[in-house]
C-alpha cells in the first residue's frame, strides 16, 4: 500500500524534491534519471525501484525514490513522500504490475497502453500541477505551501528573462 501511494504521490513529491530549473534537465537529460511514473524491481528506468533481496535478508528490503534531486530540501521532500506512503496504507491502494521494460526504450503509445505517465518536463509544468494539489497543501500547511509556490514562481520568471549563451550563439547570427 505504501509503495502504491508513493507512486501516485510521486508526482506531488517531484514538486518538492525537484524544485529548481536544472532539476528537470537532469530528469529529461537521458542520464538514467527516471522520466516516467512507474515502478519495478531491478529496473533502473523506474521512478520507484524495489530491488530484489536474498531469501532470509528481508531487513535489507528497501524502496528507492530515484527522482530526488541532490539539492532538494529534505524536510519538504521527505514530508510529502512519507505522507503519500501513509496515505496509501490508510486507503489500502493497490499497486499495479512492476515494469520490467526499459521505459526509455518504449514508444509513447506503449507507455500510454501500460498507463505510464511522464514526469513534468519543467519547473513551470510542475508548479501548475502542484497548485492544484490539496494533498501537498495539507502536508506542508497552507502558509508554507503558499510561500513555496510564490518563491518558485518568482524563480521561474527570473529564469525566463535570461538570454543564455546558447541562444546568442544559435540565433544571433540569423538576425
Protein language model regions, located:
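Broad hydrophobic/π-residue packing in well-ordered secondary structure
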Residues: 1, 21-32, 39, 47, ...
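Single conserved hydrophobic/aromatic residue that forms the stacking wall/gate
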Residues: 1-9, 13-14
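Generic, well-ordered alpha-helical scaffold segments in large soluble proteins
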Residues: 6, 80-85, 126-129, 133
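Alpha-helix boundary/capping residues
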Residues: 10, 96, 133-134
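Compositionally biased, intrinsically disordered low-complexity regions
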Residues: 11, 58, 141-143
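C-terminal catalytic subdomain
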Residues: 18-113, 117
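Acidic, glycine-enriched catalytic cores built around paired aspartates
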Residues: 101-175
